[in-house]
Regions:
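N-terminal secretory signal peptides that target proteins for export/translocation
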Residues: 1-3
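Bacterial N-terminal signal peptides
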Residues: 6-18
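A generic structural motif
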Residues: 36-38, 65-67, 154, 514, ...
Length: 700
């Protein structure tokens, strides 16, 4: 009787808790509208709204059978399996909760912005899965606009790797390309494998820029370029991104064309060989040592400007070739730089090599005295494009500085210093050998900080504030350089070291910062409302003249709202009473539906320019972007003045095509003429390998 009663209690508790059994030390619980346990077959059967949560996996279905000993499961009817980074759906699934291996029939998978379909999806033990006779797409429709169909597709959601074989790229059900193998990374890939950008440009004529990318793995890829320009002809290129295990990453880029110019008034159109070769490599040897190499070879001075204006020329018009190695230690740094002119049309100061040793501030014994040194040894050779006489010299330079920082009172920091710079030249400008130049330095840095917190909170002129905090930081720096033993006019000028001259100047600075607290992410955080910095140099009797202010610089930043930012910076010359530069920027980004930017650029006797950009989303399908640059005045290199003319005008119309974005752009440039181009972008991977757009420099 006791045995029978104990058995009944055990059975009652078992049924009350649902179908719950041990999987090693981890129980599996089956929940549903109807759950039954069959002791003889050692299985649990669930029906209706079945749910299992087990070790990061959530499985839902209409019906399921789970075997307690083997941990095998068979589920059918609206099967959904959710794992970290992916979701799988199908008609029927067989799965082992212990080995994590299984299969889904008539399956559909989702990982990030990508979808996959197949007759069968095999679940592998490492959380990856294999799709049989299926396809991938970023279009979520049951009949996608495009798809990458393949016999087999391997997907690993953890690192985003995709590997497909026997591939057909289809638009609708129409194949447009066949590939034996296709590797892709859902997390790191910048643009689709095949890209075509058609358009028209005044200098080029009609064009089609084509690229094909093949990924060897997530760290190395090869991009082939084949571009046709009706006026200039065919051009081809290769971009190879690589990774060397233990030796860093790099990029090799080539581009070649036999350019013809149909605009030339010649009976026979000749061809001009033009090319570029670029190599970049970075090796982070450890957390304190690194090496960088760059090599830029071009056929002529305008190669980059003519073919890669937006992508490269505007950012770096004349790149130089060099090798640089740096070892950073807590007490010092040691570097070696080798810069060599590769292109004869460039003006380059070669350094073959330059070795630099920098000893950071080191305390001497237990004294309140610190010592630092900066020493370089350089072989200099200045080469010019006009083949003028080269200027070369061997230079050894060392700067040694002693500093005694202290606090006079609690709020005032003072740091007086003395130093000397000794420079040895293998020869002077007039041919003298072994020239020694010595310069004595001294000075003092003073700084303090005041702050006040206003407890009031509320709104002023629409700006919310909570306990306004005002910080004032005045600084004074004095620098004195005694007349060097050799005048700069007697030395070859390679950089700032050679231009050192007598100086006695104060640099005055006043920084104001306004801060408040705002609710961000569920907690109060400190944000800047405004920032103003004014600095100026006061020169004491320079070159026999009276003392005067010089080089007054102002920097203003206002962020009254998180969606609005205003910046302005200027440089003023009190001697001539002229502003040398003055730049302003206003940027509004209140929502995803519209953004507005407006800026002005002023450089004395060179340019006065206005720039504006507007992005506006009309509805869920249409948007447009307009950008303009207008020169109120520009002085060209030849002295010719341009007044009240547009420099650039550009408009882009954007159409949302569900999984694609179609863009049509028209631009007019004073230098490049009229350009029209069209781009189709995947929403899941919107980057393209070519760039024509003008950009508004958004405030930081």
């Amino acid at each position: 009787m006791i045995k029978f009663t104990g058995f009944c209690i055990f059975l009652t508790l078992f049924l009350f808790c649902g179908a719950c059994f041990a999987a090693g030390d981890k129980p599996i619980e089956v929940n549903g509208d109807q759950v039954e346990f069959f002791p003889k077959e050692k299985k649990v059967v669930g029906k209706g709204n079945v749910t299992i949560d087990y070790e990061g996996i959530r499985l839902t279905c209409d019906r399921i059978i789970v075997y307690s000993e083997t941990k095998d499961a068979e589920a059918e009817g609206n099967v959904v399996m959710q794992t970290e980074g992916s979701e799988l759906k199908g008609e029927k699934i067989t799965y082992n909760f212990n080995t994590k291996v299984g299969a889904i029939l008539k399956a559909r998978a989702k990982s990030g912005e990508w979808y996959a379909f197949g007759d069968k999806i095999e679940l592998l033990s490492n959380s990856a899965y294999k799709i049989m006779n299926g396809y991938m797409t970023s279009c979520g429709l049951l009949k996608p606009h495009y798809k990458i169909a393949a016999k087999t597709i391997m997907i690993d959601p953890a690192d985003g790797k995709v590997s497909a074989s026997d591939v057909a790229v289809k638009v609708g059900n129409t194949p447009i390309a066949y590939l034996p193998k296709y590797n892709f990374n859902l997390k790191t890939s910048g643009w689709p494998t095949i890209h075509v950008i058609p358009g028209s440009k005044s200098k080029w004529g009609a064009f089609a820029l084509n690229s094909y990318r093949y990924e060897f793995d997530d760290k190395s890829s090869l991009t082939l370029r084949l571009d046709e320009r009706s006026k200039w002809g065919l051009a081809e290129g290769l971009d190879y991104k690589y990774y060397l295990d233990g030796f860093g990453t790099g990029l090799l880029r080539t581009y070649y064309t036999n350019q013809r110019d149909v605009d030339r008034n010649e009976p026979v159109k000749g061809e001009e060989e033009r090319y570029r070769i670029q190599a970049r490599h970075r090796w982070d040897i450890n957390d304190r040592a690194m090496a960088i190499m760059e090599y830029h070879r071009m056929s002529d001075a305008t190669m980059i400007k003519d073919y890669f204006y937006r992508e490269e020329y505007e950012r770096e018009a004349s790149p130089e070739s060099y090798i640089y190695a740096l070892d950073r230690q807590p007490e010092y740094s040691l570097s070696v730089l080798a810069r060599k002119r590769v292109n004869h049309f460039q003006d380059v100061t070669e350094r073959l090599p330059e070795t630099r040793f920098n000893l950071k501030d080191q305390r001497l014994f237990d004294l309140p005295l610190y010592f630092k040194t900066d020493t370089t040894f350089t072989s200099l050779n200045k080469k010019t494009s006009d083949n003028a006489d080269d200027l070369n010299v061997m230079r050894f330079d060392t700067y040694n500085k002693f500093t005694a920082p202290l606090k006079l009172v609690d709020f005032l920091s003072v740091a007086p210093f003395v130093g000397s710079r000794d420079t040895i030249y293998s020869r002077g400008l007039n041919g003298e050998e072994d020239e020694l130049r010595t310069a004595f330095y001294t000075g003092v840095d003073l700084s303090t900080k005041f702050s006040r917190t206003y407890e009031a909170s509320g709104r002023f002129l629409g700006v919310d504030f909570n306990k306004l905090h005002h910080i004032v930081t005045p600084t004074v720096e004095y620098r004195y350089i005694h007349q060097p033993s050799i005048d700069p006019s007697e030395l070859g000028q390679f950089d700032d070291i050679d231009a050192i001259d007598q100086k006695s100047a104060f640099t005055l600075g006043l920084e104001n910062r306004f801060q408040t607290k705002r609710m961000m992410g569920g907690s109060l955080k400190t944000v800047d409302l405004g920032y103003l910095l004014i600095t100026g140099d006061y020169l004491y009797k320079p070159e026999g003249r009276g003392s005067q202010f010089s080089n007054v610089i102002g920097d203003l930043e206002l962020t009254p709202f998180k969606w609005l930012r205003f910046e302005s910076d200027t440089r003023y010359d009190p001697d001539t009473k002229d502003f040398q530069t003055w730049n302003t920027d206003l940027y509004i980004n209140k929502s995803d539906d519209w953004q507005l930017g407006f800026g002005s650029r002023y450089e004395q006797n060179k340019i006065t320019e206005l720039t504006s950009e507007l992005f506006y989303k009309l509805n869920n399908e249409w948007a447009y972007r307009v950008l303009g640059r207008y020169d109120l005045k520009e002085v060209e290199d030849n002295g010719h003045k341009l007044v009240n003319r547009f420099k650039d005008r550009e408009i882009t119309v954007i159409k949302d095509l569900h999984c694609w974005l179609a863009e049509a752009s028209l631009s007019s440039s004073r230098d490049g003429g009229i350009t029209f181009w069209m781009v189709m972008k995947l929403k899941a991977s919107p980057k393209v390998p070519f760039d024509f757009k003008n950009y508004y420099p958004h405030p930081k």
